[in-house]
């Protein structure tokens, strides 16, 4: 998907809280919004080049969103709103092989006590719930999730297990917002309970997908499946 707004390059200075950062744009210090509540400490380092997307809301306090950053020469998209859009585009373009038969694609549907990113149905009304997680934590080509403990993430996985037990389809897709990576694993050091839940889900028949993305300064799109090591 192409970014539908003006994109500017800036230099990252600091991040006083989860939602805001200071950058240098056109030789001036500017406060911008960070659409990612994760830590991103290994990405957002003082002096790195970042991409800003012009906001569409008039008179907002932060005129730009910080959506991506260069880690060395590698561009990483950190916008937490992007993964669902990229996955929806991939579903409609039949790029996720196991899910190509699901033509009815609905966003943000509730089952039990959780709201899932997608509810899919095929022509025979078989139902499949899909949860999406954006991944930005990378080291030497290997990626992990989460970068901070996530009770909500574990809850989603346990709900997916229950959906599978009821005879419906269930899956979780880790969308890696980076290009050149070769492996995905749960981040047991940061959140061992999430990793335990993910391994249990695999055992119970929940589908686990991991895909990297083509990331440029103009667009981001789902690219290839990545090896999953649980």
From Swiss-Prot:
InterPro entries membership: SfsA, SfsA_C, SfsA_N
CDD domains per UniProt: SfsA-like_bacterial
Gene Ontology molecular-function annotations: DNA binding
PANTHER family reported in the protein's UniProt record: SUGAR FERMENTATION STIMULATION PROTEIN A
HAMAP family: SfsA
One Pfam family named in its UniProt record: SfsA
Domain of life: Bacteria
Leader sequence residues: none
Organism annotation: Clostridium perfringens (strain 13 / Type A)
Gene3D superfamilies: 2.40.50.580, 3.40.1350.60
Family: Belongs to the SfsA family.
Protein name from the UniProt record: Sugar fermentation stimulation protein homolog
